[in-house]
Amino acid sequence: MNQLFKNKKGVTMAEIIMAALLLSLIFLAVSSLYVASQKFYLGSSQKVIIGYEAQYAIQHIYKNTMRAIGDETSSPSTSGIQLPNTANPSTERLDIRINANDPVTSSNYSTVTIYSYYKSGNTLIFDNGVTQESLIPKVTVTAVNFTKTTNALTGYITAYYSDPAKALTFYFSCYPRQASFN
């Protein structure tokens, strides 16, 4: 009987075990690469969502800041951009005086609407005097800050999508148009 198998070519049990081990190592490497790529994809997707939401809010603030109308040389109540908490130069609320008249004349100059941005709960609210809406509905806002220096409005928005440890902060600055009529 030994004579039958003596010259036959075949695969030994040791070779089969080695092949199985090599295949399992390759499978583990490929699966760990897949898991890492999925984790990277999910993290990147969350950052993109936060970025889009914050970008929309910042553009909204910028657009209305550029429409602000007021007198920076008079009392603070006529300034185009107002931070209601005057004791603190940085605040979570921003009021913008908008004149919707077209064209703006000396007779309708003082007819203004106040647009407000403020943090309420976990969102950034825009109030146009008639309705209120959340500017960032898809993400959780953890911090909002507005600071007014001489002729600039600066601030930041901090938000996260699903994991508070992965919060992102977006900074912005606006230089509203200044005009003086004598």
Annotate each predicted stretch with a short phrase.
Residues 16, 111, 168:
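Exposed loop/turn and edge beta-strand positions of beta-sandwich/beta-sheet ligand-binding modules
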Residues 39, 45-46, 61, 120-123, ...:
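Short linear sequence elements within intrinsically disordered, low-complexity coil regions
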Residues 72-150:
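Type IV pilin-like appendage domain
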Residues 132-182:
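Short linear sequence signals and composition-biased patches located at protein termini or domain-edge surfaces
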Residues 3, 32, 80-82, 93, ...:
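Acidic/proline-rich low-complexity IDRs
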Residues 1, 61, 84, 107, ...:
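Compositionally biased, intrinsically disordered low-complexity segments
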Residues 2-4, 8-66:
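Aliphatic-rich helix starts adjacent to a transmembrane/signal segment
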